[in-house]
Design a protein with these regions (language model features):
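Short helix-loop junctions at transmembrane helix boundaries
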Residues: 325-346
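Membrane-spanning helices that line or support transport/gating and their immediate boundary helices
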Residues: 42, 46, 284, 334-341
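Hydrophobic alpha-helical transmembrane segments of multi-pass inner-membrane transport and secretion
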Residues: 16-44, 253-294, 313-327
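Helix-boundary and loop/linker segments of multi-pass membrane transporters
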Residues: 11-14, 123, 254-255
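Short, membrane-interfacial amphipathic segments enriched in basic
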Residues: 1-6, 303
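Basic-flanked hydrophobic alpha-helices used for secretion and membrane insertion
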Residues: 41-249
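Short alpha-helical segment immediately N-terminal to, or the first helix within
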Residues: 139, 283, 294-295, 308
Length: 346
């Protein structure tokens, strides 16, 4: 074994030009394969991330569920994450907007909207706390509001009730929209405690945002029936079930276009590399035949000849493959990050 290895190493060392060219080809091939696979995987992940920002990361939504239905949903093993949003009521001056309580899970699941993002302070936790953008506070007559300030707003719990003054403490300031095309349409966050105080237990309604766990074993082919079956078992009407199809298409269905392009490129690179390495081997093939002939004449068996040729190739890959992997990963990572940054700047 050691003799065969020494002969293989000596052969590679003797044919320096050929060995260097082969090592460069292997290194370049490895590097290109790593770059394509890494960038392709990054593109798929980026598309999924952008889908969450555009459509939200919840699998679905159960609208207007009562307390009993909420408890049933929480018991389901197929449900992974649950977020609760409640409509607090109506604030005068924000009739076309939303006054809601939303827990941290919901805020993470919602599509990106700068009006949901805190600029200062914290989201409401105590009963009388509120968070909104400065545009809202300006619209209701409070200018230069700061975190910790107290404001009195006209509030009613529903269309059937009358407005009444309620004192709130500003817990946070949200970012404002770039332009308000609809009058009195602001995002205002309240707390769950405020909702519980103002709405009787039997009248409370919850919007349940959720994702499914791996145990649900869903795909685009069966996700809708699975979600509807969960709703039925929890006593939720089908008309109150919303499935986030646009997001699920990215999460549950791979990007076939990206995979196909990467597959074609990888196949082309492999074929091209095989041709290049084959042609390099043809250089000085006469001398190699003579060398192998002499070794065989000395009594080498067919198995030993195969081992010799195999080990010559192994010695050439010891250095070239790790270098190709390293440079491929670094180039792919830096190049992909640069492309993403350029895309964000546009």
């Amino acid at each position: 074994m050691k003799t065969i290895s020494r002969i293989a190493y000596s052969n590679d060392k003797k044919n320096k030009t050929r060995s260097i060219l082969i090592m460069m080809s292997i290194c370049l091939t490895t590097m290109l394969l790593v770059i394509i696979s890494t960038v392709g995987n990054g593109m798929i992940r980026l598309q999924k991330s952008q889908a969450a920002g555009s459509y939200g990361s919840n699998y679905g939504l159960f609208v207007a569920a009562d307390g009993t239905q909420l408890k049933e949903v929480e018991r389901r093993a197929e449900i992974s994450d649950i977020g609760i949003m409640c409509t607090e009521g109506i604030l005068k001056g924000n009739e076309n907007g939303g006054f809601v309580s939303a827990d941290e899970t919901v805020r993470k699941m919602l599509p990106y909207n700068q009006e949901y993002v805190l600029k200062e302070g914290t989201y409401p936790e105590k009963a009388q706390e509120i968070a909104a953008g400065r545009a809202f506070f300006d619209a209701v007559g409070y200018h230069d509001v700061k975190v910790g300030d107290t404001v009195t707003l006209e509030y009613r719990s529903g269309m059937q009730s009358e407005y009444a003054p309620v004192e709130f403490t500003v817990s946070g300031i949200l970012y404002d929209r770039d332009e308000y095309t609809i009058e009195a349409s602001y995002v205002v966050f309240g707390s769950q405690d405020f909702y519980n105080e103002r709405v009787a237990e039997g009248d409370r309604q919850y919007n349940i945002y959720f994702t499914l766990s791996d145990s649900a074993n869903v795909s685009m082919n069966n996700v809708a029936p699975v979600i509807k079956e969960i709703a039925d078992s929890c006593g939720i009407d089908q008309k109150n079930v919303i499935i986030n199809d646009l997001y699920l298409q990215w999460v549950l269905q791979p990007s076939y276009e990206t995979i196909a392009v990467c597959g074609v490129l990888i196949l082309a690179i492999v074929l091209f590399s095989v041709v290049v390495i084959y042609n390099i081997f043809q250089v000085g093939i006469t001398n190699k035949i003579q060398e192998y002939g002499k070794i065989k004449a000395l009594g080498a068996t067919k198995k030993q000849m195969k081992q010799l040729i195999f080990r010559e190739g192994i010695f050439l890959t010891f250095f070239s493959i790790p270098v190709g992997l390293l440079f491929g990963f670094l180039i792919a990572k830096c190049g992909f990050n640069w492309l993403v940054e350029q895309g964000n700047l546009v």
